[in-house]
């Protein structure tokens, strides 16, 4: 049975509550944008692609239930305002903001068409959200296959197996299915070319220990869990061939925001001459921002560091700094940036994506909500 973070059918949306993993697999029903926003903020669902999918599908569920209106102007305003709430839930990842921009503009255009009705605009917005789910799964398979082939060509072209280190959770639980960085690992495993996987626990929220380890065991992929502080030693002593991570936002020069701890992995990988890859869909690329210095970094509550399962583990009165993400400079991404459109060196990203996406009449400009 396929592991699913999101279960959707017209009028119905459920998410796998990732706070309860790995002990319990509990699906929670979301019937409104407000419920989706709370789930995203609480990290019951996380991962840049999954956040955008859940956000837009929650809007689709509300629209299917008759929310919005009366009148075209009121309906378009409802779509815009609900999407703005979702964008504010977790600001670092670009996927939700871009989807909100595209949906808002599309709803406004549809409403201006001759003969437009509330029903036609609703149907168009709902269909857009549903199409996102199918596209994300297709893109993930492409990322996995393209990344696996490129990694093998760079590290072991003679047909041997490779060992990969990954960080945080970038698999089926963070996407519509299959995953980005973990999708590359899945593809290597399916090809019979994966020797072993090392996944970091990913403090303070332990997405690696709770989620990635869960996925790897579920899929019977050979893997070992390590603490974040063991990564350098693993690269030296465990034969790591490459490091593959995901991304919440990749900007024009290739600088990449990803889960806190990614930056230090890239530094250590470069020191040891190990290729460092970023795997992300083009929807995670933000070409309006020139460098990573422009990325807004979300800061999380102090209790995520000071408490564990409701039990205080840090001294009372200690100060806490808890950024959820860090930015890896493009020069440390030595393997390449893996997208559904190909694998690119950071300096190639802007031209490559602009040429491909613009030829299809789309845009990768950062959303302005």
Swiss-Prot record:
Its EC number is 5.3.1.23. One of its GO terms (biological process) is L-methionine salvage from methylthioadenosine. One of its GO terms (molecular function) is S-methyl-5-thioribose-1-phosphate isomerase activity. The modification Omega-N-methylarginine is found at residue 158. The active site is at residue 248. The modification Phosphoserine is found at residue 366. The record marks 168 as: Transition state stabilizer. Gene3D superfamilies: translation initiation factor eif-2b, domain 1, Translation initiation factor eif-2b, domain 2. Disulfide bonds: none annotated. It is an enzyme of class 5 (isomerase). It is found in: Cytoplasm; Nucleus. The modification N-acetylmethionine is found at residue 1. Keywords: Acetylation, Amino-acid biosynthesis, Cytoplasm, Isomerase, Methionine biosynthesis, Methylation, Nucleus, Phosphoprotein. It catalyses: 5-(methylsulfanyl)-alpha-D-ribose 1-phosphate = 5-(methylsulfanyl)-D-ribulose 1-phosphate. InterPro entries: IF-2B-related, IF-M1Pi, IF_2B-like_C, Initiation_fac_2B_a/b/d, M1Pi_N, NagB/RpiA_transferase-like. The keyword Amino-acid biosynthesis applies. One of its GO terms (cellular component) is nucleus. Pathway: Amino-acid biosynthesis; L-methionine biosynthesis via salvage pathway; L-methionine from S-methyl-5-thio-alpha-D-ribose 1-phosphate: step 1/6. Catalyzes the interconversion of methylthioribose-1-phosphate (MTR-1-P) into methylthioribulose-1-phosphate (MTRu-1-P). NCBIfam families: eIF-2B_rel, PRK05720.1, salvage_mtnA. Belongs to the eIF-2B alpha/beta/delta subunits family. MtnA subfamily. This is Methylthioribose-1-phosphate isomerase. It comes from Rattus norvegicus (Rat). The lineage of its organism: Eukaryota, Metazoa, Chordata, Craniata, Vertebrata. The gene is Mri1.
């Amino acid at each position: 049975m396929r592991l699913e973070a999101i279960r959707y059918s017209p009028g119905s949306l459920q998410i796998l509550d990732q706070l309860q993993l790995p002990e319990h697999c509990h699906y929670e029903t979301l019937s409104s944008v407000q419920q989706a926003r709370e789930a995203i903020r609480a990290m019951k669902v996380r991962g840049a692609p999954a956040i955008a999918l859940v956000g837009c599908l929650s809007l689709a569920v509300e629209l299917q239930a008759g929310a919005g209106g009366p009148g075209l102007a009121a309906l378009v305003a409802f779509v815009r305002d609900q999407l703005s709430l979702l964008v504010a839930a977790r600001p670092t990842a670009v996927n939700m903001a871009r989807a909100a921009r595209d949906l808002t503009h599309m709803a406004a255009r549809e409403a201006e068409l001759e003969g437009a009705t509330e029903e036609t605009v609703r149907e168009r917005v709902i269909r857009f959200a549903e199409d996102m789910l199918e596209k994300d799964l297709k893109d993930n398979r492409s990322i996995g296959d393209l990344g696996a082939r490129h990694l093998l060509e760079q590290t072991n072209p003679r047909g041997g197996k490779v060992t990969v280190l990954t960080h945080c959770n970038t698999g089926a639980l963070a996407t519509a299915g299959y995953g980005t960085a973990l999708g590359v690992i899945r593809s290597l495993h399916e090809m019979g070319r994966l020797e072993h996987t090392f996944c970091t626990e990913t403090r303070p929220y332990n997405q690696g220990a709770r989620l990635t380890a869960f996925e790897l065991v579920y899929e019977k992929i050979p893997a070992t869990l390590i603490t974040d502080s063991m990564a350098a030693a693993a690269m030296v002593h465990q034969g790591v061939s490459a490091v593959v991570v995901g991304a919440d936002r990749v900007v024009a020069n290739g600088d990449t925001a990803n889960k806190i701890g990614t930056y230090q992995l890239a530094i250590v990988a470069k020191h040891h001459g190990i290729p460092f890859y970023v795997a992300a869909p083009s929807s995670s690329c933000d070409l309006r921002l020139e460098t990573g210095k422009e990325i807004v970094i979300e800061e999380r509550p102090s209790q995520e560091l000071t408490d564990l399962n409701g039990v205080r583990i840090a001294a009372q009165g200690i100060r806490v700094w808890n950024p959820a993400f860090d930015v890896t400079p493009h020069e440390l991404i030595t393997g390449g940036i893996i997208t559904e459109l190909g694998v690119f060196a950071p300096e190639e990203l802007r031209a490559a994506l602009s040429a491909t996406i613009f030829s299809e009449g789309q845009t990768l400009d950062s959303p302005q909500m």
